[in-house]
From Swiss-Prot:
Family: Belongs to the universal ribosomal protein uL22 family.
GO cellular component entries: cytosolic large ribosomal subunit
Subunit structure: Part of the 50S ribosomal subunit.
One function term, GO molecular function aspect: structural constituent of ribosome
Described purpose of this protein according to its UniProt entry: This protein binds specifically to 23S rRNA; its binding is stimulated by other ribosomal proteins, e.g. L4, L17, and L20. It is important during the early stages of 50S assembly. It makes multiple contacts with different domains of the 23S rRNA in the assembled 50S subunit and ribosome.
Keyword RNA-binding: yes
This protein's name: Large ribosomal subunit protein uL22
Pfam families: Ribosomal_L22 (PF00237)
Source organism: Christiangramia forsetii (strain DSM 17595 / CGMCC 1.15422 / KT0803) (Gramella forsetii)
Entry keyword annotation includes rRNA-binding: yes
PANTHER family linked: CHLOROPLAST 50S RIBOSOMAL PROTEIN L22-RELATED, LARGE RIBOSOMAL SUBUNIT PROTEIN UL22M
GO biological process: translation
């Protein structure tokens, strides 16, 4: 491997150390309802995001709270020597994609049937460490 490739690979590896992922697949909530909660915590610091999710009444907030705690644990596993409070973690990216649909039939008048689409979603959460903040 050349010198430039090795240096670039080391830079990418260092950048990945500051980032932690968590993914929730096939969550049985519609993507529209999940995006409402995801928009509230996007870009927020981890502590504030946890408080927002904890005190929200929506069902999607419980699932997102567990996902955020999992992402924090993933970051701690990557950076065992770093302190969680000093790192100033924030929600760098949160993405809600549509998952598979369960199609069901509901009886309708005059012998017809209406299709019910029970939607699911996939949520990807990326945490970033904000060590060099501009105040």
């Amino acid at each position: 491997m050349g010198v430039r490739k090795r240096e670039r690979a080391e830079q990418i590896k260092e950048a990945k150390k500051q980032v932690a992922f968590a993914k929730l697949n096939n969550c049985p909530t519609s993507p529209r309802k999940m995006r409402l909660m995801a928009d509230l915590v996007r870009g927020e610091k981890v502590e504030k995001a946890l408080h927002i999710l904890k005190f929200s009444k929506k069902e999607a907030s419980n699932r997102l709270e567990k996902l955020l705690v999992s992402a924090i644990a993933n970051w701690q596993a990557k950076n065992e020597d770093a302190n969680l409070e000093e790192a100033e973690l924030f929600v760098k990216e949160i993405r809600v994609d549509g998952g598979s649909m369960l199609k069901r039939l509901r009886p309708a008048p005059q012998g017809r049937a209406h299709r019910i689409r029970k939607r699911s979603n996939h949520v990807t959460l990326v945490l970033g460490a904000n060590n060099n903040t501009q105040s």
